[in-house]
Amino acid sequence: MRFHGRLLTAFALPNGLGHHRFGITASRKAVGNAVERNRTKRLLRETFRLSGDALGTLETKYDWVLNAKAALLKVKLESSLEDFQTIVGQAAALEKRSNSQGARK
């Protein structure tokens, strides 16, 4: 599944484990030099760490890959957290919709 946010793009695949895992990409083309890439990676790591409650609402555990966008450099942690939690909400809605369709068959 792919989800687009204002500050990041997230890819999620079910992993069959009892916990979520995540990876980060922050390319020089998309974000900038090493200092900027490292800052975006720190922001995304902290965003994922603080999103534990939102991720707990998902029945399925996923492998997440978060792709940083250049706009992430211009915002505070709260904006990044809000954007990712919106994405998790979209994933939960998609999961709920697919579960309800599976129950009808």
PLM feature spans:
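Positively charged, solvent-exposed patches that mediate nucleic-acid binding
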Residues: 1-105
